[in-house]
Amino acid sequence: MRTEAEAAGPPLEPGDFVQLPVPVIQQLYHWDCGLACSRMVLRYLGQLDDSEFERALQKLQLTRSIWTIDLAYLMHHFGVRHRFCTQTLGVDKGYKNQSFYRKHFDTEETRVNQLFAQAKACKVLVEKCTVSVKDIQAHLAQGHVAIVLVNSGVLHCDLCSSPVKYCCFTPSGHHCFCRTPDYQGHFIVLRGYNRATGCIFYNNPAYADPGMCSTSISNFEEARTSYGTDEDILFVYLDS
């Protein structure tokens, strides 16, 4: 007969379970998920000042079209150590025909490509590379966090109620992109994982309840590697 301790399974080793105290900040509009994620990260680092944040948005001329490279420049503005990993250094011309990108593609292509071109001179760290789940877990195990671009139509939270978990932009009555075959870009903040259950913990700025979301590693991988994301991930370091 197995003892209660044996039935519970082997004890977790250091690094097997990480759950960082990253505060949840809800987005206000359908377009500002990346900015809400940046606020979460800065607050976690103890560097969020709302007035300074608004001044930074004006200085960097951030509008309603926010790309991951914009968030990297924002982190640099606040002196936050970061590393932006992506599969595409610039804008993928193939996105021009995707409904999510189509509306602002022509005007944004030049702006975004210029940001990539100037990144090194501006000391914004950008790398073209592939990131594994193990890389992400090792980063989180050190107390660091990451902002990840995902396809919200694929991402599935195991903790959220059914009417909400497939909706990316529900706050304040704004347009809701429910689960559809089309790509819907959305930023989330990674805050931990559980190796034993094979799950990833994250904050979704689209809603504050339940506060922390959780999904399987396989679902997370599907969402972050969907065509349209460029596998963008912005690593942010605690020792900033």
Swiss-Prot record:
GO terms for biological process: liver regeneration; response to cAMP. InterPro entries: GUCD1 (IPR018616). Pfam families: Guanylate_cyc_2 (PF09778). This is Protein GUCD1. It comes from Homo sapiens.
